[in-house]
């Protein structure tokens, strides 16, 4: 294998908008800012909101619920 062709892997600090900081390895040479992390993302915190608004199927059923089919 060729030597010295791989980029240097450095420890950098990734800071989230919520204030949480993570020390990670990366090939970039500067610290990064994250929008979300595992401390503030709704999936990981369990604070997801599921909106149950009428979709296409419920609109279809509501529209054609009163129709009587003749044989």
UniProtKB/Swiss-Prot annotation:
Q: InterPro entries annotated for this entry?
A: Ribosomal_bL28/bL31-like_sf, Ribosomal_bL31, Ribosomal_bL31_A, Ribosomal_bL31_sf
Read off the Pfam families from this record: Ribosomal_L31
- Tell me which cofactor or cofactors this protein depends on: Zn(2+)
Alphabetized Gene3D superfamilies for the sequence: Ribosomal protein L31
User: Quick check: keyword Nucleotidyltransferase in the entry?
Assistant: no
What GO cellular-component annotations does this UniProt entry give? Answer: ribonucleoprotein complex; ribosome
GO BP annotations of the record are:
translation
Q: Which domain of life is it from?
A: Bacteria
Record keywords: Heme included?
no
Give residues annotated as binding Zn(2+): 16, 18, 37, 40
Recite the UniProt keywords alphabetically: Metal-binding, Ribonucleoprotein, Ribosomal protein, RNA-binding, rRNA-binding, Zinc
Q: Describe, as the record does, how this protein assembles with itself and its partners.
A: Part of the 50S ribosomal subunit.
Question: PANTHER family, per this entry?
Answer: 50S RIBOSOMAL PROTEIN L31, CHLOROPLASTIC (PTHR33280), LARGE RIBOSOMAL SUBUNIT PROTEIN BL31A (PTHR33280:SF6)
What is the documented function of this protein?
Answer: Binds the 23S rRNA.
The record ties this protein, via HAMAP family, to:
Ribosomal_bL31_1 (MF_00501)
What family is it from? Belongs to the bacterial ribosomal protein bL31 family. Type A subfamily.
Q: What is this protein called?
A: Large ribosomal subunit protein bL31
Gene encoding it?
rpmE
